[in-house]
């Protein structure tokens, strides 16, 4: 398939709807100047059209393969993901203290919009990683942030969200998985997870060195 990015429309939406110019007036997002924003929006459009869109059909025809417990992606996916990471697209809005660029999340949304329009199945990989980064940045302990964020932000590791259960699909509120705090012993302060999760998007693949699974569970 071919993909033609709607760069000018996206720039208009980012300026008018997302208020990027107002964000850039703050100290936190001062780097989000017009020239940089245009370079990001134009650059990711070209990248999505040139590297991810052509793999849409490849993914349909070849598909992923599971052999001896190892999931292998079709030809071209590993190189495209490596280029995505090398060019810094995964780190656009990642916290600067963990190797990210610290830019407004609006720009990460634009990256994901372009990648998703070009190849939605492939785009779910970075989308889930960005979600894991956001969750850990806002809710993770300092220890968890130090352990996981640098490699998630760099793209060396990827992330997932473990929500779906046999009886809880779109009705996430029906989940039964529980998390019980361990109070004693060598694992004190951690949680014992009990339950079953299924249909974990990008739950196994060969593109990242490690996959971090965020599990949704109920506390007692």
Feature-to-residue mapping (PLM):
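Core alpha/beta catalytic barrel or barrel-like domain that forms the active/cofactor pocket
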Residues: 91-96, 118-133, 155-165
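Short helix/loop capping segments that flank catalytic or ligand/cofactor-binding pockets
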Residues: 93, 101-104, 170-172, 201-203, ...
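Internal maturation/activation junctions in enzymes
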Residues: 129, 140-182, 186
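Short, well-ordered loop/turn and helix-capping segments at boundaries between secondary-structure elements
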Residues: 19-20, 117, 134-142, 154, ...
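A short core secondary-structure module
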Residues: 189-220
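Short, flexible loop/turn elements at secondary-structure junctions
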Residues: 98, 165-167, 183, 197, ...
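Amphipathic, small/basic residue-rich leader segments at the start of a protein or domain
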Residues: 1-123, 147
